[in-house]
Design a protein with these regions (language model features):
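Short glycine-aspartate micro-motif
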Residues: 4-6, 26, 73, 188-190
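Glycine-rich beta-strand-to-loop/alpha-helix junction loops that act as flexible
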Residues: 9, 87, 191-193
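Gly/Ala-rich beta-loop-alpha elbow adjacent to hydrolase catalytic centers
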Residues: 2, 6-10, 22
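Conserved functional loop/turn residues at catalytic and ligand-binding sites
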Residues: 8, 102, 184
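Acyltransferase/transacylase module recognition
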Residues: 1, 129-132, 136-223
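Alpha/beta catalytic cores of group-transfer enzymes, especially the acyltransferase/condensing modules
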Residues: 17-168
Length: 223
């Protein structure tokens, strides 16, 4: 594959696959990322929710209308599916307002933190410090689309800063898939357990050929 992307933590898999980050460094930094995101959770009662069947703009506008605390879009997964993140009372209020605005479903998620929001700034700062200990390699022939803005990584990017900012910014997975398709991608292979990302791809563009695998043998057969 000449272009790859991952959702949230999966971006590290894409960076390792493309040899932008070495495998050993990737394992170390992923472990630290998880530790910091738990250790530096701000005080409070946090939650996330999946919102189905509404345009992104409506979800963004409704989140701004919430009066019971902090809530923002955190994951733009695919057409008609966005996850919101924030204080539990604010998330619950947003879910009610979004139902009134026409959402087909709102589903509270089993999460413990305001992930991919500005509330994780301290974890982001700690991660940036830890990233100074790893090596970033020159980008060769394998492109990686980054979550933060759905564009390709380049050698001019401050990749360590981008990865630190990754935990405090929304994941733009839908736009990432759209940009890959715009570059001529017509086949996507999801690597990992389950078929969640394959579903996101199909909802974004039903004409794309999608394969799913969780082992090397099957992956090689697909190729």
């Amino acid at each position: 594959a000449n272009i790859s992307a991952g959702l949230s933590l999966g971006e590290y898999s894409a960076l390792i696959y493309s040899n932008i980050i070495n495998f050993e460094d990737g394992i170390k930094i992923v472990q630290k990322r998880g530790t910091y995101m738990q250790e530096y959770l701000p005080e409070g009662n946090w939650s996330m929710a999946a919102i189905l069947g509404l345009d992104d703009k409506i979800i963004e506008d409704v989140c701004k209308q919430v009066t019971k605390g902090f809530v923002v879009p955190a994951n733009y997964n695919c057409q008609g599916q966005v996850a919101i993140s924030g204080e539990k009372e604010a998330v619950l209020q947003a879910m009610e307002l979004l139902k009134e605005a026409g959402a087909k479903r709102t589903i509270e998620l089993k999460t413990s933190g305001p992930f991919h929001t500005s509330k994780l700034q301290e974890a982001s700062d700690k991660l940036y410090d830890a990233l100074q200990e790893i090596q970033i390699n020159k980008i060769a022939d394998k492109k990686v689309i980054k979550n933060i803005d759905a564009t390709e990584y380049t050698d001019n990017d401050d990749i360590k800063r981008i990865l630190a900012n990754h935990v405090i910014n929304p994941v733009k997975f839908k736009k990432s898939i759209e940009n890959m398709i715009d570059q001529g991608v017509d086949t996507i292979i999801e690597i990992g357990p389950g078929k969640v990302l394959s579903g996101f791809v199909k909802k974004t563009n039903k004409d794309i050929q999608v394969f799913n695998t969780n082992n090397i043998e099957a992956f090689e057969q697909i190729l």
